[in-house]
Amino acid sequence: MKTFSAKPAEVTKKWVLIDAKGLVVGRLATIVAMRLRGKHLPTYTPHVDCGDNVIIINAQHAVLTGRKREQKTYYKHTGYVGHVKERTARQILEGKHPERVLEKAVERMIPRGPLGRVQMGNLRVYGGADHPHEAQQPEKIDIAKLNRKNTRAA
């Protein structure tokens, strides 16, 4: 029996919709990263983008466990010597772009490189309940039903 290797032309990509309301950020990010890479498929091939297109709504209502909301810090560098800025998860979630916490969590679970950047392009995260991808008819996945630990009362 020969080892199967998917070709980019053979891959069919599905659209998946996930509602992040009340879901734990890290647990959601692992499931999304696995879907983006295509590791949930029996035809997974490491060097081919065979994952799904994932839409996440209500990202601002995702939950961090423990004291991570106040204690987890995100760093960014301005490009100038000594100009490292830091913000807590709370500041980001209450700020202008609350979806960035979830984007960063998923981004750090995807391999860095050209294929990883393509796979991250298949992720769309929205802070509210509205999204412009109704025409793609995404399949809704209920992450809370997969495991009781995936959800947390805020």
Curated annotation (Swiss-Prot):
GO molecular function per UniProt: mRNA binding; structural constituent of ribosome
Alphabetical keyword list: Ribonucleoprotein, Ribosomal protein
GO cellular component assignments: cytosolic large ribosomal subunit; ribosome
A matching Pfam family: Ribosomal_L13
This protein's record includes keyword Ribosomal protein: yes
GO biological process terms, semicolon-separated: negative regulation of translation; translation
NCBIfam families assigned: rplM_bact
Protein name: Large ribosomal subunit protein uL13
